[in-house]
Each structure stands twice: as C-alpha cells, then as structure tokens.
C-alpha cells in the first residue's frame, strides 16, 4: 500500500472521530441548556401565579375601599412587569421586588382591622406564603441546573465546543433576603 494513502486514511479516521466526539459534546450542551431553560420556566410559572395573587389583592383593596392608591399602582406595575418579561436576566430580579411588594400589601391588616375578618384576604396570605416556598424550591433546582451547565460548559472539549457554537453562561439567582 501507498504510504500517502495510509496517512490520508488515518487523517480521515481522526477527523471522523473528532467530529463524532464534537457532536457528542454539542448534544450534551444542548441537553443541559434545555434543562436550565425548563427549570427557569418552572420558576417563571410560579412567578406568573403571583399575578393571580396581585389581582386578588387589588380586588380586595378596591372592594374594601381602602385608601392605598400607591400600593394599588405598584401592584399593577409589578403585574405588567411579570407578564412582559420572560428572559432570565429580566425575570429573576422581579422575584425579590414582588416578594417585598406583596409582603407590604399583605400587611394592610395592621392598618385595616376589617381585613382580619376577610376570609379571602386570610387565604391570600397563605397562598402567598405557599407561592414563596414554591418559588424558592424552583429556584434551588434552577441554580443547581445552572451550576451543572456552567461547570460542564467550561471544561475541556465542551469548552471548545461551547465557544465555537457560542453557548453563553446562565445567571444564578441570589436571594436578597430569606422567607
């Protein structure tokens, strides 16, 4: 056999192996990225449940003729912000903002005693607390998935493949204050 033919055959086999390995790493990166997006969607769906809580609080404020126009206006702005933003970097800060705003709105019973007798209002406080725990659990899973993705993406051949195909890092969610 001709030595040039053997060299070409070896190079061809090496290129095929590199291609197969590269495709494997690419597929794993796509799979991990999809898992991160799925976990973020779980966080986002829980955040959208807050829109229902915001609507209910707004109804209670207007029904009971409470003079809390500032809170009502802030609630409407928060609702719009949640519904308009769906990217990770825009949505994660809304969690802290909505937590603070809803805590403020749900503390109106310290000013208006009639709210303590309102069963809908009291159920709403429980619903909010459950929603907080659900979001925190979803965020914990999201952060774990982001860590796995970012770590995998930054190592060895996966790093090369991720740079070639421009896979970007995902942001972690950092809670400003605990529940």
Task: Describe the function of each predicted region.
Residues 2-179:
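A helix-centric hydrophobic-segment signal that preferentially recognizes long
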């Amino acid at each position: 056999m001709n030595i040039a033919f053997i060299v070409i055959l070896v190079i061809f086999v090496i290129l095929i192996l590199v291609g197969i390995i590269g495709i494997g790493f690419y597929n794993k990166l796509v799979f991990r990225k999809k898992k991160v997006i799925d976990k973020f969607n779980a966080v986002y769906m829980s955040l959208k449940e807050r829109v229902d809580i915001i609507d209910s609080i707004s109804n209670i404020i207007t029904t009971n003729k409470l003079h809390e126009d500032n809170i009502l206006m802030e609630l409407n702005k928060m609702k719009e912000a949640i519904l308009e933003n769906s990217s990770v970097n825009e949505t994660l800060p809304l969690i802290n903002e909505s937590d603070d705003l809803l805590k403020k709105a749900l503390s109106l019973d310290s000013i208006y005693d009639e709210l303590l007798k309102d069963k809908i209002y009291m159920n709403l406080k429980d619903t909010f607390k459950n929603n907080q725990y659900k979001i925190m659990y979803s965020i914990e899973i999201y952060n774990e998935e982001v860590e796995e993705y970012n770590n995998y993406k930054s190592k060895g051949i996966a790093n090369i493949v991720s740079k070639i195909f421009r896979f970007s890092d995902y942001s972690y969610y950092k809670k400003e204050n605990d529940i």
